[in-house]
Amino acid sequence: MDKSPTKTSIRTKFARHQPISDVDTTEQSSSCIKKDDRGLSSFGVQSSVFSRRSCRMSELEAKPTIISEDQRIAVRSEIGGSFSGFDDKVDNVFHSNNNLHGSPSTTELECPGIMNPRFLVGRSLNSRSRAVTRGSKRTSNVKENEGSIHRSDDQVSTENCSAKDEERDRDSGGVSSYGNKRSDEFCGTSPILEAKGFGISNTCFNCKKYGHRATECSAPQRECANCGDPNHRANECASWSKNGVQEPTKVTYVPVVDKMEEVFSMLKINAGDFFDKFFDASVQLVSRGQPVTIQPCKSFSDSDIPQSMRRNVERAGYTRTTPIQQYTLPLVADGKDILACAQTGSGKTAAFLLPIMSRLILEKDLNYGAEGGCYPRCIILTPTRELADQIYNEGRKFSYQSVMEIKPVYGGINVGYNKSQIMKGCTIIVGTIGRVKHFCEDGAIKLDKCRYLVLDEADRMIDSMGFGPEIEQIINYKNMPKNDKRQTMMFSATFPSSVQEAARKLLREDYTMITIDKIGAANKCVIQEFELCDRTSKVDKLLKLLGIDIDTYTTEKNSDVFVKKTIVFVAQQKMADTLASIMSAAQVPAITIHGAREQKERSAALKLFRSGAKPVLIATAVVERGLDIKGVDHVINYDMPNNIDDYIHRIGRTGRVGNSGRATSFISLADDVQILPQLVRTLADAEQVVPSWMKEAAGGTSNPNKFEKSIDTEEPEEAW
């Protein structure tokens, strides 16, 4: 037998193969032969682009099949001649396949002489099966009669490629499901082979012509199946559906759970030089309008925190209790409702997490999956997703190596994933109002055993965001325990009188109000500075403040902007993106976070900022409250907020736990004059220097409480 070399390699998948000695192979193709564990062999393809999976063998013997001469000539002529042993190979391919699974027997040839590297030269002889070829809508009747194949040419359809396959090719970048890259030279299947029943149709889906694909078509594109626009396809359409109703995008994001080592490192902030200033603040406790005296908990060792949690507290860097913690720990243990107001960075999160978790662990009142659902003992509501995620990690930190489970429930992540996590057992839920309300309504969260309800940044949810009715609805669910059987706690750095009135409706009559220092006082560890400017000069002032040359848009490599973390607050989402583009041009690593970004992007942005990979964060109101980020040295108010409470929360992102911080605000008399009287009083209370121009401008301001302007606050949908 002549064994002249050839470049042709053959891959076969069928029930039973001929012995290797009967198959003519070249030196090149012989390296592709593989054997399974039973000693049976199969051909592999030499090219690396093809899969090298071993062929599956049948338990039954294959029957020989007679090949018609027309089919043999068609294949041989397309390859461009004959080679030794070719007839034997073709005979081996066309055979009966009666394996256990009824899968068709196919062979794929890869030959440089043909137009398409993939075509089928075998068909299943099972009368029930249909010959299926990739990229075509062909049906073929194949019958077995006395060991021969009968195929009628009029039964072979050469219809155009399906849109589904074209979309799959585009999505995979031209890589077919077979694993090989399409080449420009292989633009279609041979008409000879296609007429004989072989090959894959490669007709353009767009113009219906043969020889190219829709992605390469020069003819005008077909119109969008959704809106009718010829300039794009349906999968790129941003319009509403045909019925005129805009359907919400399906959320598929599943957050990555950080490792505990990362959590301890990320949330650990060492006490600064001004930590003792917290203990100089005055403390007031009032219940039913009368002062209350209780014994404060001066250290964590004096509390009833379990030993396992106490080790985590020490590992987190807590050395002594702050004033808000000293009075909250005993009040929670006594079962009191609490309305607490303390300055930013004073440890309010630990003030409610530690006593609640301690009581639940000591009393062994925990939710397990064996209870048949999610029966949380504590629900913590927050105004933003980022704050919910932070409190969730704080809870993980304190409950590390304990049996307690704490889970986040907020919008922007996959609903099914969120439900599956809490259904495994969840003692404490931390979430935003919309998602928690949703899960309560559909029964995923059962409130029958809820003992604690905490509202963090309560003034924001009740007043600014208008979630008072939703909070009341959650409290008034029929299965939610009443006030006398449930503790309700509210915490914030600011509590306007109007919010206090609304909050009293959610608390017991004998609730205790804790005030550290003064309600609405700014953090004295933060140095507050101001720049008088107009709208057009803000950009230049910001760049100079960050050490960027405004003429060349360059930054020195040893500039502080690369080392110290800076948060820039703006009023509008578009301005955040614009400033980020400007800083990117100046080679300053900056990133944005606002309500228009998807939750996956927001989480990634915050993580990059925390790690220092992006030391400049340009943000709207979504991060102005509650976030505890290590190493924030500078806060810049590019746009002033619409009230003094938001200003206090913004500058409170720096100067945490007694560390010094710096805040710079750009003041435009055309836009910000109405907030100046409140700002002057805040500076005086914080023992800060008040600029003379600010005093002068504030003296001529009337009705300072009616200050409103367009600002990008957290929309109600954000809570979902």
UniProtKB/Swiss-Prot annotation:
It is found in: Cytoplasm. A motif (DEAD box) lies at residues 456-459. One of its GO terms (cellular component) is nucleus. SMART domains: DEXDc (SM00487), HELICc (SM00490), ZnF_C2HC (SM00343). Pfam families: DEAD, Helicase_C, zf-CCHC. InterPro entries: DEAD/DEAH_box_helicase_dom, Ded1/Dbp1_DEADc, Helicase_ATP-bd, Helicase_C-like, P-loop_NTPase, RNA-helicase_DEAD-box_CS, RNA_helicase_DEAD_Q_motif, Znf_CCHC. Residues 1-11 have a biased composition (Polar residues). Residues 329-513 form the Helicase ATP-binding domain. GO terms for molecular function: ATP binding; ATP hydrolysis activity; DEAD/H-box RNA helicase binding; JUN kinase binding; mRNA binding; RNA helicase activity; zinc ion binding. A motif (Q motif) lies at residues 298-326. GO terms for biological process: cell differentiation; gamete generation; germ cell development. ATP binds at A342, Q343, T344, G345, S346, G347, K348, T349. Residues 1-34, 125-180, 696-720 are annotated as: Disordered. PANTHER family: ATP-DEPENDENT RNA HELICASE DBP3 (PTHR47958). Interacts with csn-5. Interacts (via C-terminus) with kgb-1. Interacts with zyx-1. Probable ATP-binding RNA helicase. This is ATP-dependent RNA helicase glh-3.
